């Protein structure tokens, strides 16, 4: 069954995202896609709340979103781009690597992470590279390149 986009500015609801990505609670880290050009780029929102399980241990006295989860949220937005490539075989694309990731500022409960990803390249119809950035209140908090691989 082909997955259809919302007609509203190529946005994706949380239900549509769940139809594209295999991630589920507590690892579904994209709440809404607010801009989407299939196979090219996407901009998404991750609302960071104190109710998320990682804040029980990271850190109880001063909760911070773990950097690996910021990168994972960028990877999930990148995964939305890669899964929508019309010429690629259908299957499970997994996170295969990162390059030049830098963390600039902490992300706290109550923040809204705005994640932008853009496709950089596809090789041999099974490897993809995406440039990702995450912002809070217009300030860059994390950026880097993310790689994906198609698993048979």
Curated annotation (Swiss-Prot):
InterPro entries listed in its UniProt record: FabA_FabZ, FabZ, HotDog_dom_sf
Highest taxon above the source species: Bacteria
Active site: 58
GO cellular component: cytoplasm; membrane
Keywords, in A-Z order: Cytoplasm, Lipid A biosynthesis, Lipid biosynthesis, Lipid metabolism, Lyase
EC number in record: 4.2.1.59
Single Gene Ontology BP annotation: lipid A biosynthetic process
Substrates-to-products reaction catalysed: a (3R)-hydroxyacyl-[ACP] = a (2E)-enoyl-[ACP] + H2O
Keyword hit for Lyase: yes
Top class in the EC scheme: lyase
One annotated GO molecular function: (3R)-hydroxyacyl-[acyl-carrier-protein] dehydratase activity
Location within or outside the cell: Cytoplasm
Family: Belongs to the thioester dehydratase family. FabZ subfamily.
Job of this protein: Involved in unsaturated fatty acids biosynthesis. Catalyzes the dehydration of short chain beta-hydroxyacyl-ACPs and long chain saturated and unsaturated beta-hydroxyacyl-ACPs.
HAMAP family: FabZ
NCBIfam families for this protein: fabZ, PRK00006.1
Name recorded for this polypeptide: 3-hydroxyacyl-[acyl-carrier-protein] dehydratase FabZ
């Amino acid at each position: 069954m082909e997955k259809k986009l919302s007609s509203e500015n190529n946005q994706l609801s949380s239900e549509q995202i769940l139809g594209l990505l295999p991630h589920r609670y507590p690892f579904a880290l994209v709440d809404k896609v607010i801009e989407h050009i299939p196979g090219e780029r996407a901009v998404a929102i991750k609302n960071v709340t104190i109710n998320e399980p990682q804040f029980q241990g990271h850190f109880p006295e001063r909760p911070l979103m773990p950097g690996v989860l910021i990168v994972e949220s960028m990877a999930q937005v990148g995964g939305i781009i890669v899964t929508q490539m019309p010429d690629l075989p259908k299957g499970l694309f997994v996170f295969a690597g990162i390059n030049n990731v830098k963390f600039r500022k902490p992300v706290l409960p109550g923040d809204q992470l705005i994640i932008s990803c853009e496709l950089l390249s596809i090789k041999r119809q099974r490897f993809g590279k995406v440039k990702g950035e995450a912002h809070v209140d217009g300030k860059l908090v994390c950026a880097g390149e993310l790689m994906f691989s198609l698993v048979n």
